Amino acid sequence: MTGSDLIAMMILAAGLFAIGLFGVLARRGIMFQLVALEVALSGPALGFVAAGAYHADPQGQGMFILVLTLAAAEVAVGLALFLRIRRIAGSDDSDVISGMKG
């Protein structure tokens, strides 16, 4: 991998992170926010793999596995919260959470 390939991959990773962050902040639906958060987490994961490939270091792949594991845990917790909030509030809008008591 050359230096220009690394720069292109890092720009792509930053773009994925920015798109995911925008999706989390712009959308009100909890499911859309979870999907956007997954997109945002794929950016740093791509950056770790690209940097590891550039430096011929397997730690980038190890960090990718760590990010992938954390993303899976985030989805599991997020879906459980989504189902609970939808059952209680009857809506998948994240603004409903601020109006809940207890």
Curated annotation (Swiss-Prot):
The chain crosses the membrane at residues 6-26, 30-50, 63-83. It is a multi-pass membrane protein. It comes from the Bacteria. Signal peptide: none annotated. GO terms for cellular component: NADH dehydrogenase complex; plasma membrane. It catalyses: a quinone + NADH + 5 H(+)(in) = a quinol + NAD(+) + 4 H(+)(out). One of its GO terms (molecular function) is quinone binding. Its EC number is 7.1.1.-. It is found in: Cell inner membrane. It is an enzyme of class 7 (translocase). Keywords: Cell inner membrane, Cell membrane, Membrane, NAD, Quinone, Translocase, Transmembrane, Transmembrane helix, Transport, Ubiquinone. GO terms for biological process: ATP synthesis coupled electron transport. InterPro entries: NADH_UbQ_OxRdtase_chain4L/K, NUOK/Mnh_C1-like. Pfam families: Oxidored_q2 (PF00420). NCBIfam families: PRK05715.1-2 (NF004320). HAMAP family: NDH1_NuoK (MF_01456). Belongs to the complex I subunit 4L family. NDH-1 is composed of 14 different subunits. Subunits NuoA, H, J, K, L, M, N constitute the membrane sector of the complex. NDH-1 shuttles electrons from NADH, via FMN and iron-sulfur (Fe-S) centers, to quinones in the respiratory chain. The immediate electron acceptor for the enzyme in this species is believed to be ubiquinone. Couples the redox reaction to proton translocation (for every two electrons transferred, four hydrogen ions are translocated across the cytoplasmic membrane), and thus conserves the redox energy in a proton gradient. This is NADH-quinone oxidoreductase subunit K. It comes from Rhodopseudomonas palustris (strain BisB5).
